[in-house]
UniProtKB/Swiss-Prot annotation:
Keywords: Disulfide bond, Glycoprotein, Hemostasis impairing toxin, Hydrolase, Protease, Secreted, Serine protease, Signal, Toxin. It comes from Echis ocellatus (Ocellated saw-scaled viper). Monomer. Snake venom serine protease that may act in the hemostasis system of the prey. It comes from the Eukaryota. Glycans are attached at N44, N79, N103, N154, N251. Disulfide bonds join C50-C66, C142-C210, C174-C189, C200-C225. Residues 1-18 form the signal peptide. PROSITE patterns: TRYPSIN_DOM, TRYPSIN_HIS, TRYPSIN_SER. This is Serine protease sp-Eoc49. It is an enzyme of class 3 (hydrolase).
Length: 258
């Protein structure tokens, strides 16, 4: 069984930070509060929680399966119980998907582009990250981060985002771990073969960052996170760069790659 890495109906998030709960990366440590400036938190009052990435002053990138009603988007957030002075809250003005029905598969088109209701201002804790110029190289060291579970299968949830490093692996490694994968897909296989480090529940939609560019979007993985020889699957952003840039430029009829 595979696990879509979004947390739903597990917690009711309140507008008061002191009452909010959170989720994070297994095997990582607390992120430096000054080094996740593009990281966004997506949530609603019914308990759906995801990550996202600021790629433009008006645009956030996330996973299609993170679409939710009454979405709120926070940027510049670190400790859920102790808000930063420069953090900003936004709502979606538009959402764009590769498929009109908002469908996706476990290996294709799990991507959502969100236009914010108003631009964000750059600050010490908020700044967009670059889209990829090329796909990441095999064995590249990349960064994962988010408010996702830090233990699995018995999940625990701290108040701060966790960060960790993982490697880009051969796609065949994920095919061996998850037999349902096709021979080719628009996803990246990334993780640590020995296990112990992984994205998990609540990290969906968050970034896989390689060399200062967003190369992947947290999509799905094993039901128990951080198992040996069971890496995570990430939407391959470089395959969608033209679509993303066209939408941002105002071409809302742009189509995704087949």
């Amino acid at each position: 069984m595979v696990l879509i890495r979004v947390l739903a109906n597990l917690l009711v998030l309140q507008l008061s930070y002191a009452q909010m709960s959170s989720e994070l990366v297994v095997g990582g440590g607390e992120c430096n509060r000054n080094r996740h400036r593009s990281l966004a938190l997506l949530y609603n009052s019914s308990g759906t929680l995801c990550g996202g990435t600021l790629i433009h002053e008006e645009w956030v990138l996330s996973a299609a399966h993170c679409d939710m009603e009454n979405m709120k988007i926070y940027l510049g957030l670190h400790n859920l119980s102790l808000p930063n002075k420069d953090q900003q809250k936004r709502e979606p003005r538009e959402t764009h998907f590769c498929l009109p029905s908002r469908n996706y598969t476990l290996w294709d088109k799990d991507i959502m582009l969100i236009k914010l209701n108003r631009p964000v201002n750059n600050s010490p804790h908020i700044a967009p990250i670059s889209l990829p110029s090329n796909p990441p190289r095999l064995r590249s060291v990349c960064h994962i981060m988010g408010w996702g579970a830090i233990t699995s299968p018995n999940e625990t949830y701290p108040d701060v985002p966790h960060c960790a490093n993982i490697n880009i692996l051969r796609y065949s490694v994920c095919r061996a771990a998850f037999g349902r994968l096709p021979a080719q897909s628009r996803t990246l296989c990334a993780g640590i073969l020995r296990g112990g480090i992984d994205t998990c529940l609540g990290d969906s939609g968050g970034p896989l960052i390689c060399n200062g560019q967003i190369q992947g979007i947290v999509s799905w993985g094993a039901e128990v996170c951080a198992k040996p020889h069971a890496p995570g699957l990430y939407t391959k952003v470089s395959d969608y760069t033209d679509w993303i840039q066209s939408i941002i430029a105002g071409n809302t009829t742009a189509t995704c790659p087949p």
